[in-house]
């Protein structure tokens, strides 16, 4: 909203024209979200401790996690607040893509909040009943998917971008809604499954958001979009502001979530961030790129699917415990080693994903 104010004030002082530059607003969006989360962190942690809103740890989990019992959770509130305020300050309020992401971010944040509340108040590790969680995730995702489809119906905004093939971009039609639904819900739950160790989920989220910031900038620039053979989407540029806000808020949260964590993000953070990343990928027409850059989330999810499927079909487990980060813990890896190695893998996957944009 400050952009509109700057457009008015530029008549009196030309220096306010700097607010029209996307790169400038991206930087201050990151810094705004970072400083808000750093300021909010100690206050939120103290408030959560006062209310005794602490993590409920599974009794069948790794023994090293028992010491985490009682650590404040629902820290994702600071992430959501930081992102929302920063985006509202620095993005153009008239941009529909921005509102689609915020709708998912806040909507999934509410679902996650209810889930966390049931866990910490009722001391139930299962939280919100799975079918109700999935129901509300589906309703919110479908509402966003139909809205996004109506915005870009029968244009390049609803084409499927296939990696490595610059001339293959089929028009999806209503299949766009179905694809968007699965990407949003799937990514939300994938990030949620990954959030099992201190800082494990937030840093890959930051890496992927940073990668999408570059993609959004290129997609919103007609010359670079043509150069990379990706669809030019006129609303995509403002998603840079959203992505950098996620980066800033994520880094601010990591300050308190790094091992040993002072606070956990909880489902209010993981479901919301995953949903936001999925929505950004859909809006940029880069669902396949999300699979590559978010490979850590994909592997974590597949490990759970394979573990459950193998046990039901063969009565045997593939991993010592799923998601797969627990498998490595039970193999004797110290928690910080698991975390940092997953971070390194995530960074590599983001760089590989970005490289595929030119391999067409």
UniProtKB/Swiss-Prot annotation:
Entries under Pfam families matching the protein: Glycos_transf_4, MraY_sig1
Cell compartment(s), UniProt: Cell inner membrane
CDD domains cross-referenced by the UniProt entry: GT_MraY
Keyword Membrane appears in the UniProt entry: yes
GO term, biological process aspect, one: cell division
EC identifiers of the protein: 2.7.8.13
GO terms for MF: metal ion binding; phospho-N-acetylmuramoyl-pentapeptide-transferase activity; UDP-N-acetylmuramoyl-L-alanyl-D-glutamyl-meso-2,6-diaminopimelyl-D-alanyl-D-alanine:undecaprenyl-phosphate transferase activity
Cofactor requirements of the protein: Mg(2+)
Catalytic reaction list: UDP-N-acetyl-alpha-D-muramoyl-L-alanyl-gamma-D-glutamyl-meso-2,6-diaminopimeloyl-D-alanyl-D-alanine + di-trans,octa-cis-undecaprenyl phosphate = di-trans,octa-cis-undecaprenyl diphospho-N-acetyl-alpha-D-muramoyl-L-alanyl-D-glutamyl-meso-2,6-diaminopimeloyl-D-alanyl-D-alanine + UMP
Any one Gene Ontology cellular component term annotated for this protein: plasma membrane
Keyword terms: Cell cycle, Cell division, Cell inner membrane, Cell membrane, Cell shape, Cell wall biogenesis/degradation, Magnesium, Membrane, Metal-binding, Peptidoglycan synthesis, Transferase, Transmembrane, Transmembrane helix
Superkingdom of source: Bacteria
Coiled-coil zones: none
Main localisation: membrane
Membrane topology: Multi-pass membrane protein
Disulfide links within the chain: none
Regions that span the bilayer: 27-47, 72-92, 94-114, 132-152, 168-188, 199-219, 236-256, 263-283, 288-308, 338-358
Role description: Catalyzes the initial step of the lipid cycle reactions in the biosynthesis of the cell wall peptidoglycan: transfers peptidoglycan precursor phospho-MurNAc-pentapeptide from UDP-MurNAc-pentapeptide onto the lipid carrier undecaprenyl phosphate, yielding undecaprenyl-pyrophosphoryl-MurNAc-pentapeptide, known as lipid I.
Family membership noted in the UniProt record: Belongs to the glycosyltransferase 4 family. MraY subfamily.
Protein name: Phospho-N-acetylmuramoyl-pentapeptide-transferase
């Amino acid at each position: 909203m400050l952009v509109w104010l700057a457009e008015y004030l530029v008549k009196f002082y030309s220096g306010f024209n700097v607010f029209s530059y996307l790169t400038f607003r991206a930087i201050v969006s990151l810094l705004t979200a970072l400083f808000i989360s750093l300021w909010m962190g100690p206050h939120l942690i103290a408030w959560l401790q006062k209310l005794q809103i602490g993590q409920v740890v599974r009794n069948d989990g790794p023994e090293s996690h028992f010491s985490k019992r009682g650590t404040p959770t629902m820290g994702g509130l600071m992430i959501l607040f930081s992102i929302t305020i920063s985006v509202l300050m620095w993005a153009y309020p008239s941009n529909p893509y921005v509102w689609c992401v915020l709708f998912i971010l806040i909507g999934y944040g509410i679902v996650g909040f209810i889930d966390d509340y049931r866990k910490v108040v009722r001391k139930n590790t299962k939280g919100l009943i799975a079918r109700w969680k999935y129901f509300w995730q589906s309703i919110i995702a479908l509402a966003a998917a139909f809205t996004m489809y109506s915005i870009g119906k029968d244009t390049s905004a609803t084409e499927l971008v296939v990696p490595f093939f610059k001339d293959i971009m089929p028009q999806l039609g209503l299949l766009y809604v179905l694809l968007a639904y699965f990407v949003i819900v799937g990514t939300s739950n994938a990030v949620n499954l990954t959030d099992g160790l201190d800082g494990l989920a937030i840093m890959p989220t930051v890496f992927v958001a940073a990668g999408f910031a570059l993609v959004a900038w290129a997609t919103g620039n007609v010359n670079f979009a043509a150069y990379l053979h990706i669809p030019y989407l006129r609303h995509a540029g403002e998603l840079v502001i959203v992505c950098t806000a996620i980066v800033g808020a994520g880094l601010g949260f990591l300050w308190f979530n790094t091992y040993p964590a002072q606070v956990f993000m909880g489902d209010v953070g993981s479901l919301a961030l995953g949903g936001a990343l999925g929505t950004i990928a859909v809006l940029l027409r880069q669902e396949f790129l999300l699979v590559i850059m978010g490979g850590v989330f994909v592997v974590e999810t597949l490990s759970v699917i394979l573990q459950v499927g193998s046990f039901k079909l063969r009565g045997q487990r593939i991993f010592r415990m799923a998601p797969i980060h627990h498998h490595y813990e039970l193999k004797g890896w110290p928690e910080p080693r698991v975390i940092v190695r997953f971070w390194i893998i995530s960074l590599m996957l983001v760089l590989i994903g970005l490289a595929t944009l030119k391999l067409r």
